[in-house]
Amino acid sequence: MKKILVLHGPNLNLLGSREPSIYGHASLTQINGDLIQEADNAGIRLSCFQSNAEAELIQAVHQAGIDKINYIIINPAAFTHTSIALRDALSAVAIPFIEVHLSNIFSRETFRHHSYFSDIAVGVISGLGTKGYLLALQAIIKELK
């Protein structure tokens, strides 16, 4: 069975209550549930992990390599603009990944315009809200079939 890992970065545990005008009203639990359902329907095992700690996300990426995860969907959140270490972990395991952002990072503060991940990602989806996760998953399902 093919396996996908969804990684959520810092503060995404607050989705649904954190700045809903930017991030929407869906909770992380709702987003994960929708993704798991979609993957189950396609016969793919999907697991989700959220952490506010960079080291825990790096360890999850390392474990994904050991677990032979086929694909990663990652919303690095604020680590998008700061974490060379998380980027290096993704490069080290060589698992293809899609970078997802709920908001359009290019329409926000200038410090959010740079991503340490985009140039090594298979693709980037930004600004489509929670649909971005689903679109990433649908693209991966088509690729894995």
Swiss-Prot record:
<dbReference type="InterPro" id="IPR018509">
    <property type="entry name" value="DHquinase_II_CS"/>
</dbReference>
<feature type="binding site">
    <location>
        <position position="88"/>
    </location>
    <ligand>
        <name>substrate</name>
    </ligand>
</feature>
<dbReference type="InterPro" id="IPR036441">
    <property type="entry name" value="DHquinase_II_sf"/>
</dbReference>
<feature type="site" description="Transition state stabilizer">
    <location>
        <position position="18"/>
    </location>
</feature>
<keyword id="KW-0456">Lyase</keyword>
<dbReference type="GO" id="GO:0009073">
    <property type="term" value="P:aromatic amino acid family biosynthetic process"/>
</dbReference>
<feature type="binding site">
    <location>
        <position position="75"/>
    </location>
    <ligand>
        <name>substrate</name>
    </ligand>
</feature>
<dbReference type="GO" id="GO:0003855">
    <property type="term" value="F:3-dehydroquinate dehydratase activity"/>
</dbReference>
<keyword id="KW-0057">Aromatic amino acid biosynthesis</keyword>
<feature type="binding site">
    <location>
        <begin position="102"/>
        <end position="103"/>
    </location>
    <ligand>
        <name>substrate</name>
    </ligand>
</feature>
<feature type="active site" description="Proton donor">
    <location>
        <position position="101"/>
    </location>
</feature>
<feature type="binding site">
    <location>
        <position position="81"/>
    </location>
    <ligand>
        <name>substrate</name>
    </ligand>
</feature>
<keyword id="KW-0028">Amino-acid biosynthesis</keyword>
<dbReference type="GO" id="GO:0008652">
    <property type="term" value="P:amino acid biosynthetic process"/>
</dbReference>
<feature type="binding site">
    <location>
        <position position="112"/>
    </location>
    <ligand>
        <name>substrate</name>
    </ligand>
</feature>
<feature type="active site" description="Proton acceptor">
    <location>
        <position position="23"/>
    </location>
</feature>
<dbReference type="InterPro" id="IPR001874">
    <property type="entry name" value="DHquinase_II"/>
</dbReference>
<dbReference type="GO" id="GO:0009423">
    <property type="term" value="P:chorismate biosynthetic process"/>
</dbReference>
<comment type="subunit">
    <text>Homododecamer.</text>
</comment>
<dbReference type="Pfam" id="PF01220">
    <property type="entry name" value="DHquinase_II"/>
</dbReference>
<comment type="similarity">
    <text>Belongs to the type-II 3-dehydroquinase family.</text>
</comment>
<comment type="pathway">
    <text>Metabolic intermediate biosynthesis; chorismate biosynthesis; chorismate from D-erythrose 4-phosphate and phosphoenolpyruvate: step 3/7.</text>
</comment>
<protein>
    <recommendedName>
        <fullName>3-dehydroquinate dehydratase</fullName>
        <ecNumber>4.2.1.10</ecNumber>
    </recommendedName>
</protein>
<comment type="function">
    <text>Catalyzes a trans-dehydration via an enolate intermediate.</text>
</comment>
<dbReference type="GO" id="GO:0019631">
    <property type="term" value="P:quinate catabolic process"/>
</dbReference>
